[in-house]
Amino acid sequence: PIGIDTYKEEIESFLDSLPKMPDAFVCANDHVGCILLQLLEKRGLRIPQDIAVSGFDKNIENPLSESLTTAEVPTMGLGLRLATQILFRIQHPDDPFEVIYLATKVLFCSSTES
């Protein structure tokens, strides 16, 4: 199974399977985006001149994340909204479901700016 410990190997395998590199990658999260940045640079690709990369979630734990374009997710608001919805669902199991949107902010960095 794919997990945090196997991301690098799985991404390398995925890159090897591509007949041609795309112009850009939009990653599911910043952790994957930072791994991808390293692997693409290791292959001699220039970021962003040859290929652009973006992440999602503004993970500040990785030093590479400073160069990664990302979407800043309001995690506190997301957690509070989720908890509220769970409590509501427990109290009202037959009510209709809702679709809820939370605004994100795109933070443009050097991984997409050329």
Short names for language-model regions:
Residues 1-8:
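Short beta-strand elements in bilobed, periplasmic/extracellular small-molecule ligand-binding domains
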Residues 8, 12-114:
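Flexible loop/turn connectors
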